[in-house]
């Protein structure tokens, strides 16, 4: 099953005949593999780890699958397809990345849902691309085409990072935020509640849904001897977290994980402001899986503490998995849930 943007690309796949194709920011479908019907070869770079895991089992000699904020090589392509990102500030970064990998006069295709901001594509395209031309309008999506007409500046993460000081209960820390990663540039209420009641931890600790590394840096500021692991599904968040830790002279293991699936062993502590805020059935089930898996991966005497929107149905799930839990603090928007393993 292809998403609507992918169906629009298939409608126009004749422009890819015998091309070496790169697909950037692809979705959780098999579009890159489907393009092998016409393309010479396809490489796919996912910025969402779920999307990578969906496609990776289909890799073959003509289809290479990658996850991250950049490719691990400098290969050039006849066509680069960009899925317009949900986080609009990420779009210019993806265009710069596309330009690094296009042959001279190579083809750029940009697809996105009408409501997702792709309509502003012509204004957003950098000057090293020709003016964007609308190629198709179908499935509530738009497809634009362009070509590389000039040399693009070399891509440097520092050009796409905002760095700022953040005051936390543990002291001031430096945060590095790449484009496309959510940031309020001040401590949000949920994280502030969590950090204001941070337990004393020891040993191996997991920061689930680490984002740009705010909780990780605050944790290590207060408790620098922790063996910390930071996981997320977003490539830009993981890169931001690594930059944040480096800026503060801290070290932790930072890696992608689908829930806790890519973690191993048990933890002495699990801390999170989990990224489940919308109350949708899909994210509620992910949240429930996180709670259930956490219960299995907590060491004896291990501490589990998360902050969550008080209107979300966490209490029943947590009570079912952990039995007894405490609410050390709450306000009108958030609750702090805490549990210590027997």
Curated annotation (Swiss-Prot):
One of its GO terms (molecular function) is 16S rRNA (guanine(1207)-N(2))-methyltransferase activity. It catalyses: guanosine(1207) in 16S rRNA + S-adenosyl-L-methionine = N(2)-methylguanosine(1207) in 16S rRNA + S-adenosyl-L-homocysteine + H(+). Disulfide bonds: none annotated. It comes from the Bacteria. Its EC number is 2.1.1.172. It is an enzyme of class 2 (transferase). Pfam families: MTS, MTS_N. CDD domains: AdoMet_MTases. InterPro entries: DNA_methylase_N6_adenine_CS (IPR002052), Mtase_sm_N (IPR013675), rRNA_ssu_MeTfrase_C (IPR023543), RsmC/RlmG (IPR046977), SAM-dependent_MTases_sf (IPR029063), Small_mtfrase_dom (IPR007848). Keywords: Cytoplasm, Methyltransferase, rRNA processing, S-adenosyl-L-methionine, Transferase. It is found in: Cytoplasm. GO terms for cellular component: cytoplasm. Monomer. Belongs to the methyltransferase superfamily. RsmC family. Specifically methylates the guanine in position 1207 of 16S rRNA in the 30S particle. PANTHER family: RIBOSOMAL RNA SMALL SUBUNIT METHYLTRANSFERASE C. This is Ribosomal RNA small subunit methyltransferase C. It comes from Shewanella sp. (strain MR-4). The lineage of its organism: Bacteria, Pseudomonadati, Pseudomonadota, Gammaproteobacteria, Alteromonadales.
């Amino acid at each position: 099953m292809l998403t609507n943007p992918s169906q629009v690309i298939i409608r126009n796949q004749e422009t890819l005949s015998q091309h070496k194709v790169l697909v950037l920011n692809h979705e959780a479908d098999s579009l890159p593999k489907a393009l092998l019907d016409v393309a010479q070869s396809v490489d796919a770079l996912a910025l969402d780890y779920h999307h990578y895991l969906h496609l990776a089992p289909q890799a073959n000699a003509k289809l290479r699958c990658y996850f991250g904020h950049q490719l691990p090589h400098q290969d050039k392509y006849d066509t680069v397809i960009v899925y317009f990102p949900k986080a609009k500030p990420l779009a210019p970064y993806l265009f710069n990345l596309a330009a690094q990998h296009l042959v001279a006069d190579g083809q750029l295709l940009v697809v996105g849902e009408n409501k997702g901001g792709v309509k502003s594509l012509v204004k957003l395209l950098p000057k090293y691309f020709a003016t964007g031309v609308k190629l198709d309008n179908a499935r509530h999506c738009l497809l634009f085409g362009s070509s590389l007409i000039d040399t693009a500046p070399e891509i440097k993460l520092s050009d796409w990072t905002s760095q700022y000081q953040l005051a936390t209960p543990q002291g001031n820390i430096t945060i590095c935020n790449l484009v496309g990663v959510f940031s309020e540039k001040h401590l949000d209420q949920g994280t502030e509640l969590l950090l204001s009641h941070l337990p004393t931890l020891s040993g191996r600790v997991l920061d689930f849904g680490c984002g740009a590394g705010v909780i990780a840096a605050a944790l290590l500021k207060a408790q620098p001897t922790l063996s910390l692991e930071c996981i997320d599904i977003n490539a830009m968040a993981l890169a931001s977290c690594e930059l944040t830790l480096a800026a503060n002279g801290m070290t932790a293991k930072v890696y992608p994980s689908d829930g806790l699936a890519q973690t191993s062993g048990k933890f002495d502590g699990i801390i999170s402001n989990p990224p489940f805020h919308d109350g949708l059935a899909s994210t509620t089930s992910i949240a429930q899986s996180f709670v259930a898996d956490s219960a299995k991966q907590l060491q004896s005497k291990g501490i589990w503490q998360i902050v969550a929107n008080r209107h979300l149905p966490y209490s029943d799930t947590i009570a079912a998995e952990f039995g007894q839990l405490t609410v050390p603090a709450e306000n009108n928007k958030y609750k702090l849930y805490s549990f210590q393993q027997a």
